[in-house]
Amino acid sequence: MFKVSKYRHTVGKIDKRELWYPDVNTTGNSSASTFIKANSKWVALNWQSNTGTIGLIPLKSFGKRKGETFLIHAHSSGVIDFEFNPFNEHQLVTASDDSTIKVWNIDEAIRSGATSLSSASIVCSGHSKSVECIAFNPVANNILASCSADKTLKIWDLSNGEEKYSWNFEQGSLTSLSWNYDGSLLVATGKDLKNRIIDARTGESIQVGDGNQGVKASRVVWLGNLNHFLTAGFSKMRERQLVLWSSQDLSKPIKSITLDSSTGIISPIYDQDAQLLFISGSGDSSVRVFDMNTQFTKDPAFTELSPVPSDTPSKGICALPKRALDVMEVEIDRIFKATPNNIIPITFNMSRKSKSTFADDLFPNTASTKPSLSSIDWLSGENKQPILVSLNPSDNQINNDLDDLQLNDNEPVKKSTFFIDDNTNDNSNVVEQSKSEPEQQQQEEKKISSSSSSSSPTNSSSNVINSTPSSPIVNDNIQRTGIVPKVVRSSKYRHISGSAHQKSQFYTNLKINGSTSNTCIAVNSEYVAVPMVGIGGPLAVIPLADKGRQIQVPCIEIGSQLCDYDLSQHNTSLVATGSEDSHVKVFKIPTGGIPKTTANKSNNYTTTEADFVGHNRKVISVNFHPTAENVLITSGGDMVVKLWDLNEGGAGEKLSFANVHTDMITSVDVNWTGDKILTSSKDKKMRIFDPRTNKGGLASETVTHSGSKGGKAVWLGQTGNIFSVGFNKSSEREYQLWDSRNLQSGTPLASDKLDHLSGVITPFYDEDSGVIYLAGKGDSSIRMFEINDQEPYVHYLTQFSAGTPQVGVAKFAKKTSMDVKKCEIARFYRSTDSTIEPLSMTVPRNRQEFFQDDIYPDTRQTCTPVMTSEEWFDGCIREPEFVSMKPSDMINLSDAPPPPKKEDKFVVSQEVDNTPSRDQVTNSLLSRVSNQNASSNWEQIEKLKHNFTDYDNGDISDSEWD
């Protein structure tokens, strides 16, 4: 019997846009640790830029809102952290740079009809520096913990705003706090890179141990009723990591997972009922999920489930309480993702055969809004478990109304404009205050009866509109079934998916050097090459057939630090390298590959076919020409582009373009006919060269990305367009689509932000499908976009997530080697610190026995040169040859016969004779008579028996019975 978690099939989907919260304004405060929080009534957002304002949106007011957003003008400086009171859903607590903690009672402002709030109910002013983190006790009412940059930890009683305990931590200030299940202990991380288990009443550090060793702040979360907690931070190598710890032993971690090299601080969210962990860092575009179940193991399983990708970077995430979920639709969790302009709900569901019954195996009792202890009881030393409540709607009627404030009957209710929703313009949806209660009830009944029959019980019950005009008018008929745009764009590649090959196909036991300035992996139809750790710039060139564990790795020895290299697609045995000593070398791999190293002797391959010296500084990039044979393009630190003819040995330099670039060149690419060269530079410009003209070669240029890191650009096949990726002034990664014929306009056809990660992205374009793949150095994913002539021209498809950071990615160019029988449209080789992993991008199809000619057009022949180097330098222009990818034993899908129709099942009707038999008639008559008067009619009964006996003897034939 397999021991697997029951939540392993949890699938997350982004809700359709009708359920988003648009037109929000998130803060730009980089010091803010919290951007969004939610409970079953409200969604709170760190609003605007460094204004100390919190925006409040009713949970049910999704979609376009009419009127002003309710704002809490909380602090004179930026809000760093804020929390809803778990036992009072209309109370919010904020912490700020101004060293204060404030308590806000939302219900009082709602009663008054105000649209903003600026007077706090309680102000706690015990800290002397900015408050870094606050955390409510999970069992005791009004008990709050806070830590500050003044190196103190304080415990507050918010019933009166008094400071109850205060402890100093001279080793360094604490940056993150989390309570254990019964609210007796705190786990904390600090700037001294230590983890601490602290007794919340005495301030004693029960356990102290080394935590995440990165210089950036880490976050911590206690894993419910387990004796474990998790930290999310950075390693010494500045890589983001998750670390699992036991609260009983902080000397060493139980398990750690390295994520990527992004700089965004991770926000961990833990569901203690389902034992699921959700993470997303600032600037990340995806939400990752981990199963932490302890059903079969002592320690949490810590296994990753399917992530939820998107094309929008995140500012922060939060989870909705279980009480607000649609349990009858098997909604396991709902995560809110805050972006610069929207709040995006992400629902996590599980498939069930029937949703008519409550899935009690998936929804255990959850924490209620009733405290187990008062603040006085907790301060006196008492401990209790949280009070739990059932999620079954039949056992516990959960109030789904947005505003359940208990208003006095004689108290007038003022209208708050921020509650009004314009999901519909129908005036009949607005309940006027002047209408009588019977009229309102009739309208409510009509609305309920007209609702969709497919609505879940939870959604249906929420259609009843409160009689108070302050309740929002929302359309609850919208179903949470994932992304369903109003108009679905038709595309053959919408469902493209990526998958890694089996581990037996990996190349392992490698020590890959990821510090090369440009290429970290290259591949052609015979070899894959990666730079290795070692002296002399070793470059491992491994035959593709030599899969598995590499015992002896054959290497080319450059003689200096390797900067860049390339493998020829035309002559697969040629390798070109560029190094720190400004040499450009060409090697020819012997037949069968580089000889293996022998015992006690290093036989690195050093035989060169050519050694060019032309650049005054180190060589930055090396690229073989894609259409002309033996033409090499290089760029150097001297900001010069050179073209070499490999047929002429040491005197092979043919063309040179100097005094054009004013900063380091970051990418070089050649168009599909091979006559124009595209460059990107750190001087924030993109240039097109026609290298064989007499006008200096420069054809056009434009300013692209404004960031200091520079970008990379590629030609988009026969379209004549250009796709570039880089950074903006805010260090956000972005892309731009350009028309090469109109660069002088300075305006791209399309552009958008990607995320806040720091890795340089390399774009790979597939001319046959129009799909572009974006792979960032240090990322753990590859994003896919489709580019066509439909606005906005660049359409996000999906992303492949590997779970471990990548050093580099290379695209396999030989399309005729694709496995068309599995609908493979692209293949990549992905390198990590120790492995090379092949990846396949496939399109799901039903009839894979036929050649899918709609997704496999004739492809460019990349392994055969179009012309010689002499012809190219003489100015020849020749279009590449195209070949079919169709195997000889397959039939085109367009020529295939229609699929066989399923045979209809015919039910043969049978006539059944329902005429009662003789015995049935006899017994029926006898029973009727005996029931009427059993005591006085025995003689009649005997007579009837005698008569029927005569019938049985043949006096009446069988055919006379009707």
Curated annotation (Swiss-Prot):
Disruption phenotype: Shows altered chemotaxis and phagocytosis. Cells are slightly smaller, grow more slowly and do not reach the same final density at stationary phase. Affects the infection process by the pathogen L.pneumophila and allows a more efficient internalization of bacteria. Allows a more efficient uptake of dead yeast cells. Residues 434-448 have a biased composition (Basic and acidic residues). Residues 439-483 are annotated as: Linker. Coiled coil: none annotated. Residues 1-438 are annotated as: Coronin 1. GO terms for molecular function: actin filament binding. SUPFAM superfamilies: WD40 repeat-like. Residues 449-473 have a biased composition (Low complexity). One of its GO terms (cellular component) is phagocytic cup. It comes from the Eukaryota. The keyword Cytoplasm applies. One of its GO terms (biological process) is ameboidal-type cell migration. Residues 911-936 have a biased composition (Polar residues). Signal peptide: none annotated. WD repeats lie at residues 74-114, 126-166, 169-208, 212-255, 260-300, 557-597, 614-654, 660-699, 717-748, 755-795. Keywords: Actin-binding, Cell projection, Cytoplasm, Cytoskeleton, Phagocytosis, Repeat, WD repeat. Residues 417-478, 910-936 are annotated as: Disordered. The keyword Repeat applies. It is found in: Cytoplasm; Cell projection; Cytoplasm, Cytoskeleton; Cytoplasm, Cell cortex. Residues 484-962 are annotated as: Coronin 2. Seems to consist of two repeat of a full-length coronin. Monomer. Binds to F-actin. Belongs to the WD repeat coronin family. Involved in phagocytosis and cell motility. Binds to actin filaments and protects them against depolymerization. This is Coronin-B. It comes from Dictyostelium discoideum. The lineage of its organism: Eukaryota, Amoebozoa, Evosea, Eumycetozoa, Dictyostelia. The gene is corB.
